[in-house]
């Protein structure tokens, strides 16, 4: 849950600060200002992906080290967490009974700290989608796909967790010229 919050809030902040939607698309027009071609600006899109991944890694590493001076706790949605524990890199405390996978004992025993440990593996990609939207219009969408691998460290065991998400970044409606006639096939009736 914490990972999900940190990833989504980090992506939101990078997009809010760094994103100019018009730079993500290249639109070529003819002399009459009609659209000839639309393409995605690969350089700008990859810069955005790189900034997102770097910011997520930095936030996780700072939380892992307990260095709260370099992160904005409110922006990441961590204002309700115990700051003493966050300074130790602890993101959650669970009862000892949960480790034994027994529902009767799940709420009993002392609490065990769960530390965040970035396994050094955040991978990302950009997906683009073009959809027909009415007559001679197109809806362009750009999404960031992230996969994050982490280790959850408990005193008895260590478990590797994988987290995948797809976050929409930009949508743009491109309007072409509406033709003077439109033929949508022959109806047999």
Regions found by a protein language model. Give the residues of each.
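Domain-level marker for long, solvent-exposed, non-transmembrane regions
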Residues: 1-189
